[in-house]
Amino acid sequence: MFLNIVTADGAAEERVIREMKARAAGARGDIEQIVRGVMADVQARGWEAVVEYAEKFDGKAPYIVEPKVLDDAYNACDPKLIAALEKAAANIRDYHEQMLVKTWEWNRSGGETLGQTVRGLSRVGIYVPGGTAAYPSSVLMNAIPAKVAGVGELIMVTPPTENMSNEVLAAAKIAGVDTVIAIGGTQAIAALTYGAGFIPQVDKIVGPGNAFVAAAKKLAFGTVDIDMIAGPSEVLVIADHTANPIYVAADLLSQAEHDKLASAVLLTDSMAQAQAISCEMERQAKLLPRWDIIKESVANYGCAIVFDDLKDACRMADVVAPEHLEVVTAAPRELLPYLHNAGAIFLGQYAPEPLGDYMAGPCHVLPTSGTARFFSPLSTDTFLKKTSVIEYTRDALESYAQDIIALAQSEHLDAHANSIAVRFAEENDNENR
């Protein structure tokens, strides 16, 4: 069988989970050591170091891509692609406007006013890979939620390849990126982290990249914020006997083609369905240009597990906490209450994972490698800073004064207690006279 098929027995599920997590092993020590050196050098020497590394690894010094270049790139693209990008951008914008959290205020009781101000970050950097990994959809998915959130300035960095992708530059124009800078690799992340030359320090860095970029983002965290450290792509598909094997096979292959570490796993309650989907995957895969990648990723990280009950499949899905989770059953919404951990859940035969990658509106930047247990997809929330606001009248504070003093004294923080007591000391003195 093209797809390894096993019957759920406890051990089979654990093996699959273990193998999927093993794909997400951190960057090799030698990569982290190199990246640490570059980051430290840029922090110490600034622009001089950035230019040296850019000339060494990018082949030229960093430069700002002029707006006219973006306009020309937009005009050079196929009109059908521009129409698709514009439509996707509108859907992404609409979705994120629905979820945008706003400033709020609450009067709990007389004299107690509480609230929260919600503001977009001042400046955000987006890393966009070059070469074959330059995806215009990723530009839209990273930039538009930031713009909806109200980010003040959006800076995109991308390697200065011989022919910068017209599609990527057009997407930057459509998304409203403020500045595009031609610089890639660790040196780009370092410049955004510490600020150097005409590249200002940002508040947050988002976007995918290779192992060096991922290691640099990890080291940058704390000086600036980051979105997440993305691992290899993955999909789990829960399918019953009613699912169309052609559809499910195509969806599994759409993840398997990403790279040799991608994982495509089928969970079903039908051995016949598992076998049919496996055969269909092999038929379709042999017709695809990325056959060599698919063959290896499916052999290493693809499988089908047959359960007696799909609720057991849901329990496994929750442990795996996959990046993408498709539910292709007769009544997919009936399983939704049992599914808690996934980057995105796709319900039914007509919500395939590529719909989310390109067009539906929710961001396709999702937690991988089991981190959907505690991480959420990139969204407007990623680019917001929330600040608590507290306002009390004298009477309101006085009603809690002795409680606050008691709590502060129990922690031996006498200055805290005194901060409350001094506000009512004169009144107490008058009462004692």
What are these regions (language model features)?
Residues 318-433:
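C-terminal core of ALDH-fold dehydrogenases
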Residues 106-170:
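Conserved small-residue-rich beta-alpha loop and adjacent elements
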Residues 1-122:
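N-terminal Rossmann-like NAD(P)+-binding subdomain of aldehyde/semialdehyde dehydrogenases
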Residues 141-152, 173-175, 193-199, 217-219, ...:
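Alpha-helix C-terminal capping segments
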